[in-house]
Amino acid sequence: MYVSLPVHTQPVVIAAQLRNFAAFFPEALVVLHVSANARFPMPQLEAAIGKRQCRNVIINPERAPTNWGGILNAHLANVAWIRRTGPASAHICLHSSNDMLVRPGVAAWLRRGRNFRNHRPIRPGSHWRFARPALLDPGLQSLCRRLGGAPVIGSQIEGSCYEAALLFEIADLIAAEDIATPAGYPREEVWLATAAHALGAEVSGCPYIFSEIHRFDRVFWQVLRYVDPLIGRPGEPRYFPRRALEYAMIKSGFHRISRTWVDRIARDAVAQLARYEVMSDGNNEWRVFDPHGLFGVKRVPRRIDSPLRAYIDRLAAATATGPASQLEQPSHEDI
């Protein structure tokens, strides 16, 4: 199994995340895509990886520029590297630099199926703040036409997992489109799921990372049910009163991942997580995660001194069956 991981932040944080994968997902080989925008020299990253004795990683020599909403090209670069070096029968898991695993068993869970993603229909009138820019994206419209008028489908990127052969096919389709021009939404959360759905790929489950974003959206949608009739222009994400309300709620921090949430997922506390399994975007419902199918969290601050990061590191240390330095690099037979 492979993990595609685009990074751009501090080398010491990157190395710590690699140790997290080694502890909780030792079957995976992590393919790092280092952004061309990264503000550190490569020798500094290599030194940090060497110091932490990370043997579960390959650094992709291809470096594309990345920015918010422009991470798709980084994952596709990693898919291309895997295509040149690995078997088409492998699985490729997609992650971000601010998620972390909190319990073991990911590989065993993924071996039960083929592709793990959300099925989030994106239609006009959706509460999702990025629905409108996604539906108006000329590149996505072109891709959907080439796929026979495919509907637009979204999925959380973190913790999603696809058969390598499927991602190779999707990468070929996307190569004909312009993904360099900013589009005002995270393309990686829409293009892959849309193409996979259009190609008829079997869905075996949902992503295995629990994101604080879904906690925020659930509460924000409920507030909008009462506020939209008062402020007018319901469903228009850029309407100033709506944006101001959203900003105030974000700043409150009510949705942040805490140790309590980490413990719930680490214990697989299904009853305490059940109410978050399904979410409505206002005009459709979709499944966020599967019971017993959560193994990590997002967002974890990209700071090595973050108390939450330190707490998860202690969980990883307690989980490890031996000294971290003895963890071996996965071979292609494991992948």
Residue ranges of predicted features:
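ER/Golgi luminal nucleotide-sugar-dependent glycosyltransferases, focusing on the catalytic module
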Residues: 1-335
